[in-house]
Amino acid sequence: TSTEMLKGYVLSKISDGKKRNEINDIWKQQIQLLHGYDKNASQSFFHAWFRGKYAVSIRPGKAGSENQDFELIGTRFHNWFRDSHQALFGLKNSDSFYTFFKEKFPFYVKWYLKCWDARLKFNPNMPHLHYIQYWGIAESLQDPMLLASLNHGDHEEQIVDKIDSVARFIETFTVRRSINYKKFGQT
């Protein structure tokens, strides 16, 4: 899978064996958490994380246009990461790979899964996440928007407010379009 190929690439960039094993253990733990929700959750997570935080381009609607970041992440995100990790992620050496995947990977998995939980079971701190379960747009669009608002290092209260604000926007957007008989699909 793309997730396993990404893991292999990331681990190959960490030269210290002890640090490589630590990231391997973190990776296994995080992927196991994701797969506890759905067998495809790891791929959906990487699509959402990379699109939300690092994609800088999207294919124009013209016929014959080349795929850009958004589409490339959706098809082969491991190749996109390999080609983009220096420019977009700032990962230039073994230590930067280690630090990035030790700190940011678990952070974004945690909040991706908290969003998943709040969509399924009402959370009074993030009520609009539950509402967009019924009035939202495709998860492939809403999940990147939710993660895009987060910054590693934000306080939990800030994060909850940001997520709920984005979910409120999505809900407002879809409800307004719906009651005005306008489409709000993926295209």
Question: What residue ranges belong to the model's regions?
Answer:
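Flexible coil/loop and intrinsically disordered segments
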Residues: 1-187
